[in-house]
Amino acid sequence: MPPTLKVVIAGDGNVGKTSLIRRWCEGKFEVSRVMTIGVDFQTKVVSLPDGPVKLSIWDVAGQDRFRSLRSGFYRGSRAVALVYDVTESASLANLARWREEINKTVPHGKYVVVGNKIDLPRTVSVEAAHRFAEGTGASYVETSAATGEGVPEMFEAIARLASHTTR
């Protein structure tokens, strides 16, 4: 039985967190989606060079009204994907706040910055996203939940990060 590693997918509402998880875990993409209330989670086994790991993927609601609930959801996480929407510059700017919020519960957290919705016309440059990721010591990947582009790479990156984090 592979070890289970808790990872968190965080970011503003409507950036596509749930869609990324469903694309990877279920191979589905739904154009209209119901908002996540509080938290949802799924699991999936990932094969890594050191052996398989089972990711327990926590999908955290992005709306501010759930902020008071979120700190409990971060506890015990091995890695975090900070997701923003490449068509919405505020969602990238808000990742600094997300990181600060998570670091209160998970000091020295390990992060992957994810630019989602690359199938749509972007307003956030790749360079700006790279600067943010580098400034926080995070790796950077781009994805499209709609087409599936980059989604396996995103989850492999977070699995590698989680498997090399000791708690």
Task: Describe these PLM feature segments.
Residues 1-167:
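TRAFAC-class small GTPase G-domain
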